[in-house]
Regions:
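A short, conserved, highly charged catalytic patch centered on acidic carboxylates
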Residues: 1-113, 121-165
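Charged, structured surface patches that assemble and position nucleic-acid processing machinery
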Residues: 118
Length: 165
């Protein structure tokens, strides 16, 4: 089974990243992309990592009020000017997500629909409305304490049902 659909495998990957590599933000990128790419959402998306883009004429469309997000979600068409449906901003699991964070606010203003996650907590904003806020676990005394698998199932269901366009 896929890491993106199996909570035990997902937890193990987060824990390994946490223990072996201080779970730096970039450790989450492949996990986040897999969760989105393998969602059962009927709206097929192109998930593009723009986290290390430099400003250029080509990349300007991905540059918002808060700079580049980590990912942009585009229409799944093989065209350069595919419509942008939203973005994803990731933080390290050791960083608590702040709904008033300037970077998040800029991404919401620029891209409208934003998934905001540190791997343990997942939030989705549609404009200024927080549509879901699901906590898979938290760090307590330097160790990840996981919540019930039902939270994971709820997260997958919510992601599967996001209306991107």
């Amino acid at each position: 089974m896929s890491i993106a659909r199996n909570f035990d495998d997902f937890k193990e990957e987060i824990e390994l990243a946490f223990i072996q590599n201080a779970c730096v933000e970039i450790e989450l990128y492949s996990l986040i992309a897999s969760v989105i790419r393998e969602s059962k959402n009927k709206q097929k998306l192109s998930v593009r990592d723009v986290s290390s883009r430099k400003r250029s004429e080509i990349s300007a469309k991905y540059y918002g009020l808060s700079g580049f997000p980590d990912f942009v979600l585009l229409e799944r068409k093989k065209v350069q000017d595919a419509p942008i449906y939203g973005c994803i901003e990731a933080k390290m699991p050791t960083i608590a997500l702040n709904d008033k964070d300037e970077q998040l606010r800029g991404h919401i203003e620029s891209f409208k629909k934003v998934i905001y996650t540190n791997g343990l907590n997942w939030k989705f904003f549609n404009r200024n409305e927080k549509c879901f806020d699901i906590e898979l676990g938290s760090i307590i005394e330097g160790k990840i304490e996981w919540n019930e698998e039902s939270n994971w199932e709820e997260l997958l269901n919510e992601i599967d049902n996001i209306t991107w366009y």
